Swiss-Prot record:
Signal peptide: none annotated. Belongs to the inorganic carbon transporter (TC 9.A.2) DabB family. Disulfide bonds: none annotated. One of its GO terms (molecular function) is NADH dehydrogenase (ubiquinone) activity. One of its GO terms (biological process) is electron transport coupled proton transport. Its main location: membrane. It is found in: Cell membrane. The chain crosses the membrane at residues 9-29, 37-57, 68-88, 105-122, 125-145, 158-178, 204-224, 226-246, 266-286, 303-323, 355-375, 382-402, 410-430, 446-466. One of its GO terms (cellular component) is plasma membrane. Forms a complex with DabA. This is Probable inorganic carbon transporter subunit DabB. It comes from Bacillus anthracis. Pfam families: Proton_antipo_M, Proton_antipo_N.
Length: 510
């Protein structure tokens, strides 16, 4: 049985562990420190993650301790970001070996994930803006560590430029909030009494600034360029970027959620996020580069997460960003497994495949209808039901319909059932854990729900048409447009890394 500790004690232990990990990272930067010290550093870096887990398990409810807001969401996000960072650092021990910036990567990984976790523990908006700014700076430094490569320099410039705009937008929103409420504490700013003081234009203006601050790190249209060009960063950097940092918008919007209720800013966020979902999906479908496929996937997934926020489903958005982070980190760290020998897929009995396809459609429709009746019947649940039914049908098609022979279909069915059970178990556990009054879903307006459903149906119709008419003019136009949107600028692309010539001429990396 775990020893029950007070919130202030856990907070003190957390900052001691975090300071120790930062000190370890600084020590590793010293040239005289042997490279094998990295293993000790990984052990020390695990301490704040363990303390945040202990705090999460011992959480005694919503507590405000000085400038810190210690609720379940805060400790969960601290644990999530630090654990993702720890796993990626462990992966990088051998992956980045030989890189001239080897030591700097670990120091920056530790610093960036550390200040990011502190940002979500902050109740004081001044601490939050400082920590979030430090997180963005750390991310830019990670992207630009390979200074000898011109392409990386270009990616660093555009990332730094857009992140500066994002940070200034959030800073402006926070200062505006202080001028109206006279409060720096977030929990005091978003009370019903203070929110009622806001005029319509003031509320919309603040919300639009927060939306801009959120959309840029989430790589939403028209700010997706930085994420596309950052694909030149090493795989561990991309992993921490996609899994633990770009999804911060969901947490930020959740913290400021009372401000967005019944405001036109929700519709604006919904429109831009829906466009981003379409663009990201198109990029992931047409790109042949594995990392750019994942970039497109992240743009689409972050768009859907922001759609959830726009519909008032903040709890669903938080669960989405956690599951997406775990999934995307796994995909990046397992990127090498995508290089497989080409196999000729044998066509099975066409009639049998069509029969299994029909079964999948009926099953997906049945699950969607059942989910709709079982849930509370809120507007967002209808969207969830449609997505759940489509996801089940798509998974059935890939794992069962395209399975080779009877054993292949049986294996696919077992995998589908197993992962479905795991997903629902994790989803329900997180839902019960995070289900507090502050993060209750707000009933979305009927036009917003109808708009999202129309976007989903439109996307489905377009995909079906393109699949069945690949030689049509519309298919060619959509393909070329998706390729163009998903490509980096010409000066941000090289057919071969030019900096390698310098390394080869010196006999390798030193």
């Amino acid at each position: 049985m775990l020893i029950s500790l007070s919130s202030s004690t856990l907070l003190t232990l957390f900052f001691i562990a975090l300071s120790a990990s930062w000190l370890s990272g600084l020590l590793f930067l010293h040239a005289r420190m042997p490279l094998r010290f990295v293993h000790i550093h990984i052990g020390i870096a695990a301490l704040p993650s363990l303390v945040s887990l202990l705090a999460l398990v011992n959480n005694n409810g919503d507590r405000v301790v000085g400038p810190w807001h210690l609720d379940t969401l805060a400790w969960l996000m601290a644990f999530f970001v630090l654990t993702i960072g720890l796993i990626i650092q462990r992966f990088s021990v051998r992956y980045l070996m030989g890189d001239r910036s080897y030591r700097k990567y670990f120091a920056l990984f530790t610093f960036t994930t550390g200040v990011s976790s502190v940002a979500w523990l902050s109740d004081d908006l001044r601490f939050m803006i400082m920590c979030w700014g430090a997180t963005l700076i750390g991310l830019v430094l990670l992207i630009g560590l390979n200074k000898g490569w011109k392409v990386v320099s270009e990616a660093t410039k555009i990332s730094g430029y857009l992140f500066t705009i994002s940070w200034i937008a959030l800073l402006s929103a926070i200062i505006w909030l202080f001028q109206i409420t006279g409060q720096w504490q977030l929990t005091s700013v978003v009370t019903n009494e203070n929110v009622a003081q806001f005029g319509t234009l003031e509320k919309t203006g603040i919300n639009l600034l927060i939306i801009v601050a959120v959309m840029i790190p989430a790589a939403q249209w028209p700010f997706q360029r930085w994420l596309i060009e950052s694909a030149v960063a090493p795989t561990p950097v991309s992993a921490i970027m996609h899994a633990g940092l770009v999804n911060a918008g969901g947490i930020m919007l959740t913290r400021f959620s009372p401000l967005f209720h019944d405001d036109i800013a929700q519709i604006i966020l919904l429109i831009f996020s829906s466009i981003s979902v379409l663009i990201g999906t198109g990029i992931s479908l047409v790109q042949v580069d594995y990392k750019r496929q994942l970039v497109g996937s992240t743009i689409a997934q972050m768009g859907f997460m922001l759609i959830q926020c726009a519909l008032g489903a903040y709890l669903a958005a938080v669960i989405h960003l956690i599951l997406h982070g775990l999934f995307k980190a796994t995909l990046f760290l397992q990127a090498g497994s995508s290089v497989q020998r080409v196999e000729v897929v044998k066509q099975s009995n066409k009639k049998m495949s069509n029969l299994w396809m029909i079964v999948g459609r009926v099953l997906g429709l049945f699950i969607a209808i059942a989910f709709w009746f079982i849930t509370s019947g809120e507007g967002y649940q209808l969207v969830s039901a449609l997505i759940l039914g489509w996801s089940l049908y798509f998974s059935w098609k890939q794992l069962v319909v395209f399975g080779e022979g009877r054993m292949g279909r049986i294996a696919g069915l077992i995998v589908l059932i197993g992962f479905s059970l795991i997903y629902f178990t994790v989803h329900n556990s997180l839902y019960k854990w995070l289900h507090t009054d502050m993060y209750q879903s707000v009933q979305p307006s009927a036009p917003a729900v109808i708009f999202v459903i129309c976007i989903l149906l439109f996307s489905s119709v377009i995909c079906t048409f393109v699949t069945r008419n690949q030689s049509s003019t519309l298919s060619a136009v959509l393909y070329l447009w998706s390729v163009r949107v998903g490509e980096a600028r010409r000066k941000s692309v090289e057919s071969h890394p030019s900096y390698l010539k310098h390394d080869v001429s010196k006999g390798g990396n030193s």
